[in-house]
Amino acid sequence: MAVNVYSTSVTSENLSRHDMLAWVNDSLHLNYTKIEQLCSGAAYCQFMDMLFPGCVHLRKVKFQAKLEHEYIHNFKVLQAAFKKMGVDKIIPVEKLVKGKFQDNFEFIQWFKKFFDANYDGKDYNPLLARQGQDVAPPPNPGDQIFNKSKKLIGTAVPQRTSPTGPKNMQTSGRLSNVAPPCILRKNPPSARNGGHETDAQILELNQQLVDLKLTVDGLEKERDFYFSKLRDIELICQEHESENSPVISGIIGILYATEEGFAPPEDDEIEEHQQEDQDEY
């Protein structure tokens, strides 16, 4: 069973963010660059495998997780390992998976103390344990792709010599319209300086667009997943609404709550839109 650690106060023994990253990377043979990358939960699962061999099935860990529901899955695996080894620590999953620095830094500080209290110095091969899988997803893949794309499009791609139209109109057009490679290559490389470099940039942008589409698809699946759960909760509440239970009433109030200034559509408007949709078919 594990030795529990309850102290969370800041002391001289606390490592800086750089030292903490160095410890994580050296211990697990990773290449993390930010504390926020710990939000996937994969590193903690492997640390538990290092401390208590057999308490975690590493095959269940999504080492290449990129979406929030995948992070949650990894933390569920970690919670199961904590329960199995008698670790009393409550994992703030909802905060950690958001990828915020402060929440993840506080948790890794506690985990480092927990690790030091339980590690017996035995040899461990992290690459062999995870079978060579990469464990370095960005905390927010969508944001990273957006930011990188804007930077490259706004500064790296040469502009046309046409006197009409400001530069920002050209760059925004490229970003808002997801164009295939043939459209992005309007000007031949020979007509511009640094043609080969521009070709490489175009290929990179096309790959980023593909990655962005995959991210959006994943977010849509995640949205549908949680919407389905909310719908199931709504149906259960409606079945017991006649019981006048304050709990049921409270849940229904939360489900139907709207932001200030938002007006839900009237029934006749909904019927009108439904009729229009049927007419189209």
UniProtKB/Swiss-Prot annotation:
Tissue distribution: Predominantly expressed in brain and muscle.
Domain annotation Calponin-homology (CH): ranges: 14-116
Region of interest: DCTN1-binding: 217-281
Residues carrying Phosphoserine: S162, S176
A Pfam family that the UniProt record links to this protein: CH
Biased composition (Polar residues): 158-175
Basic and acidic residues composition-biased segments: 272-281
Region of interest (Disordered), ranges: 157-181, 261-281
Keyword Cytoplasm: yes
Alphabetized InterPro entries for the sequence: CH_dom (IPR001715), CH_dom_sf (IPR036872), EB1_C (IPR004953), EB1_C_sf (IPR036133), MAPRE (IPR027328)
Manganese as UniProt keyword: no
Localization per record: Cytoplasm, Cytoskeleton
Location, primary (coarse class): cytoplasm
GO process annotations (BP): cell division; positive regulation of DNA-templated transcription; protein localization; protein localization to microtubule; regulation of microtubule polymerization; regulation of microtubule polymerization or depolymerization; spindle assembly
Any one of the GO CC terms: midbody
SUPFAM superfamilies with a match to the protein in the record: Calponin-homology domain, CH-domain, EB1 dimerisation domain-like
This protein's UniProt keywords: Cell cycle, Cell division, Cytoplasm, Cytoskeleton, Microtubule, Mitosis, Phosphoprotein
Boundaries of every EB1 C-terminal domain copy: 194-264
Region (APC-binding): 217-260
Record note on domains: Composed of two functionally independent domains. The N-terminal domain forms a hydrophobic cleft involved in microtubule binding and the C-terminal is involved in the formation of mutually exclusive complexes with APC and DCTN1.
Protein family (similarity comment): Belongs to the MAPRE family.
The protein's assembly and partners: Homodimer. Heterodimer with MAPRE1. Binds monomeric and polymerized GTP-bound tubulin. Interacts with APC2. Interacts with DCTN1 and SRCIN1. Binds to the C-terminal domain of APC. Interacts (via C-terminus) with CLIP1. Interacts with SLAIN2 and SLAIN1. Interacts with AKAP9. Interacts with PDE4DIP. Interacts with PDE4DIP isoform 13/MMG8/SMYLE; this interaction is required for its recruitment to the Golgi apparatus.
Name of this chain's protein: Microtubule-associated protein RP/EB family member 3
Protein species of origin: Homo sapiens (Human)
